[in-house]
Each structure stands twice: as C-alpha cells, then as structure tokens.
C-alpha cells in the first residue's frame, strides 16, 4: 500500500506517535529505582475523555493533575517544556535531569515539587499514551492507581479522524484541517486495548467509561476517587469555573472542551460524522474488545 503524503509534516509525526514510533530505547528506565508513594495515572486511547477526567480530579482539594508530562514515556526529558506546563522551577528541573540516575527518580522529584507548588497531597499524571506503559510504571511506582478511560470506539474513531484539530502558532490556537486515515484511527484504539485489558483483575487498575462520566457524573467520580484513596468532593463538579495555569488551553489545545461545563453532545456523534462504510469497518475491527468493555455495537 502506498504511503499517504501529507501537506503538513506535523500530521505524519502525529500518526507516528500513535504507533509509538517516537519511543527511544535509550530513554527506557532500566534502573531498580522504586517509590512506594501513591500516585494515580489517567490514561487511555486519545479522544476518550482523559482530559475531562483530568481537570475534574485536579479540582479536588487533595489531588493535583496537570497537563501531559510525558515522564513515563521513553522520550527525552525536556525541562523547558515541563517548566512551561507546570511552573516547577527551571533550575530544579535542569538539576534533576543532570543528577538523577533514572527517569523514575526524576519523576519522584518532579511530583514532590509540583505537590508543594499546588499544596496538594497526591500527584496524578494524565498522559494518554501511558496506556502503553502500565507495566513499566508499576515497576517503579508499584502503588500507582491506573484509571483507564474508555469510550465507544465509534466515537473515538470519529474524533481521531480530525485529530489534532488545533495547534499553537506564535502563541495563538489555530485549526489544522487534518483528516486522518481511518485505518490509523482504528489501529490506535486497538493498540490501547491490546496494551491494557490484560491488566484487568489487578487491584490498582480500573476502567471508567466516558459515557458514565458525563451521564452519571457523581457516581462515577465517587468510584474514581475511591480508587485513588480520597472522598468525592462537590467542588469537582465546578471544574469549569477554575482558572489556573493547569487550565490554560494553549497547553492542551486539542482538549479545550475539557474546561467547559459537562455536555453529552459528543455521545453518539459518530452517527452524524462517519459514513456507513466507515462505521461498518470500525464495528468489524473493534467488536470483540467493545463487547468486553460493555458496549453494544
């Protein structure tokens, strides 16, 4: 099959990330460093609702969960990017990168600093692609509470087709106009399920449906909070009223909607935006996993 050539080279880079082609073996953490601190990890296939859950949890008085840190992915640690997203002192970030013998140790220093900065008790990392790194996360943070956000694959694929919908150019959010190949969209969802569902049964792993989060918000957040080890707080429902660095849309331009009030408008949107033959292909390839997740296609 002839490879598609995209007008915007960033689009191919995005598709490569979906397949984790940017992961580098030299950035793998082969150390024996272990932290027994409780942390939580929000992850899942992109466009499943991880950012919405992230800002809700970040509104809890005891929890902190900022934009994607990428710290658990085998990528180069970039202090400047972390400073821009989290406002942890740049000199400290650079110092840890020089001194730490492992990225897990760096992550521990980072979480302690960010917790102190935000005056919270438990750090959470929301990076969608952590879904491909659960075993590695538990290797260094055995008490990590994994929250796997899942969603009807038809809606995920529908959303992935135009991802990334926006990018930041000269400090401004602008549309990309991208249309992604259906095969890549389905493949990304399947890859996430391949890498996560065999951890079912692990007491530190839970699944949460996006649909439950927006249709039965309090019960769903109560279950998530219990998994993390805290009580649900009513203020979590007011997540969209919070203004802070962690909610700056320029730091996560693909997920601007996550800072707005809860809406059910995206449920079933595939019916309007996917062609019949596309729906048939999505159902054919995702059916078995979807049934396991409790979806009827």
Description of each model-found segment:
Residues 1-108, 117:
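PAPS-dependent sulfotransferase catalytic core
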